[in-house]
Amino acid sequence: MPSLRDIRNRIGSVRSTRQITKAMKMVSAAKLRRAQDAVLKTRPYAVLLDQTLSRLAARAAAEEQVAHPLLAPRAQRTAEVVVVTSDRGLAGGFNSNICRFVQRFLTENADRFERIALSTVGKKGREYFKARRLDIRKDYTGVHANLAYEKAEALAREATERYLAGEVDAVFLAYNEFKSAISQKQVVVQLLPIDTSAAGADATGIDFKYEPSREALLAELLPRHVAMQVWRALLESAASEHGARMSAMESATKNAEEMIASLSLQYNRARQAYVTKELMEIVGGAEALK
């Protein structure tokens, strides 16, 4: 049976842990509000840009007048999956959920591609797939620190360069899509080549006017579209991470409080037993002196 000192030390240790988890919860809550605002502001622009470019590209493809390399289909033998995770842990199942989701994607598409490589954004993704000896083409760390659109542009540019150089025939983007503070959805979307199939039927009935030209518009907007999809994924992942960490720290704080209550009860019972024992010894000694 643990001594009173051991129980008291344990209570002090758990209280210190509770202070840490409570502080982390408050910090994550503040970061979540900012990240959520950024996601909600970016989503409409990203969706509208995607729809507009998809219609424009589908119309161009239907008229067979423009063949942009980011739109042109090709035999898909090799693929790359860019997996967005975090640099830090203590976020519940945030990282493990997306990593397992990507593993299922790799298994399901093993027959579709001769080779699938990975690029990881965040230390946790790199550690997860490296431990399983999977092919990691490139890893990016520190992206989430001072998250900026320029970082998304750099990621998109490197992925586009590998695609245009023929190193890969398709690029996919995997990340946690933000739903709420307690809910995230794991998604894998095709980044390259840009898929216009969903807008094909609607686009053929639209009469577009191009200034200065269709080729110039596609050359300018398609790379921007790729960068915007990466930027949206980074923002969605950041909001999901803060929400997951806030929930995990809230749960940890509640568990710590329950443990403190249990240990305090154990301490009081042990102290009561100790006092009772002392009283019995005093009474026994007094009886012996009679």
Swiss-Prot record:
GO biological process, one term: proton motive force-driven plasma membrane ATP synthesis
GO CC terms in record: plasma membrane; proton-transporting ATP synthase complex
InterPro entries: ATP_synth_F1_ATPase_gsu, ATP_synth_F1_gsu, ATP_synth_F1_gsu_CS
Alphabetical list of CDD domains matching this protein: F1-ATPase_gamma
SUPFAM superfamilies for the chain: ATP synthase (F1-ATPase), gamma subunit (SSF52943)
Lineage top rank: taxon: Bacteria
Subcellular localization, as worded in the UniProt entry: Cell inner membrane
Keywords annotated in UniProt: ATP synthesis, Cell inner membrane, Cell membrane, CF(1), Hydrogen ion transport, Ion transport, Membrane, Transport
Role: Produces ATP from ADP in the presence of a proton gradient across the membrane. The gamma chain is believed to be important in regulating ATPase activity and the flow of protons through the CF(0) complex.
Membrane topology, from the record: Peripheral membrane protein
Family: Belongs to the ATPase gamma chain family.
Disulfide pairings: none
Assembly with partners or alone: F-type ATPases have 2 components, CF(1) - the catalytic core - and CF(0) - the membrane proton channel. CF(1) has five subunits: alpha(3), beta(3), gamma(1), delta(1), epsilon(1). CF(0) has three main subunits: a, b and c.
Record-given protein name: ATP synthase gamma chain
